[in-house]
């Protein structure tokens, strides 16, 4: 059975960018191109991949009948974003169906984060491996969940990570099903910079055209690989 609805999760590249006047995103454009109804949307600006993986699974478990009708679009973001649940209900109003609220820290977020990572560096942290594992593990984890439940999906990188140089990281990366991962060698972020499709260079996010063109390529990839079913 082909999907009738779409579910979208990721970072700000899959949300409206109101302050830049961008009232669309690649997921919404793909939704129109595929002729699907909205099933669920949990993308959140500034959030990372742990939240994407966890909230997608929770949504599916709570909405089993709707999940069976969905095509899933997952934007895997930068591995520099480390998610954690909070006790203060942060931005809970945006996701009323979720009991947990989430925040994210990164190596350069603030003084406290920088100090924490300085401490980790004294323990010989390999920051590149940490970032890469954060992204790749979420992608592999979710792809296995989708395949287990026979949910059709497509993934892509919204923001790129550093090149892989470690053999263990490469082995995990090789577990990603590239048939369902659009342009794994690049990202939506790289694409808009290369093609001058940025809404605001002060904080680069896609312009309307940047969202539309990416969605069109996603649609072509989905159709060429018969990804509507699994």
In which residue ranges do the predicted regions lie?
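Alpha-helical cap/lid subdomain in secreted, periplasmic
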Residues: 57-230
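Serine-esterase "nucleophile elbow" of acetyl-processing enzymes
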Residues: 1-57, 62, 213
């Amino acid at each position: 059975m082909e999907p009738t609805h779409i579910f979208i999760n990721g970072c700000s590249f899959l949300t409206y960018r109101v302050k830049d006047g961008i009232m669309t995103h690649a997921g919404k454009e793909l939704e129109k191109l595929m002729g699907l109804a909205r099933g669920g949307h949990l993308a959140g600006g500034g959030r990372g991949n742990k939240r994407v993986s966890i909230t997608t699974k929770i949504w599916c478990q709570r909405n089993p009948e709707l999940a069976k009708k969905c095509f899933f679009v997952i934007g895997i973001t930068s591995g520099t974003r480390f998610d954690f649940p909070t006790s203060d209900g942060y931005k809970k109003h945006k996701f009323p169906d979720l009991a947990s609220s989430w925040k994210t820290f990164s190596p350069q977020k603030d003084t406290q984060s920088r100090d924490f990572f300085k401490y980790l560096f004294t323990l010989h942290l390999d920051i590149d491996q940490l970032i890469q594992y954060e992204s790749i593990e979420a992608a592999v984890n979710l792809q296995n969940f989708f395949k287990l439940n026979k949910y059709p999906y497509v993934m892509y990188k919204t923001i790129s990570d550093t090149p892989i140089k470690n053999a263990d990281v490469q082995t995990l990366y090789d577990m990603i099903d590239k048939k369902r991962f659009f342009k794994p060698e690049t990202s939506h972020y790289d694409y808009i910079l290369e093609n001058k499709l940025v809404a605001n260079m002060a904080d680069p996010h896609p312009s309307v055209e940047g969202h539309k063109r990416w969605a069109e390529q996603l649609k072509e990839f989905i159709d060429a690989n018969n990804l509507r079913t699994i």
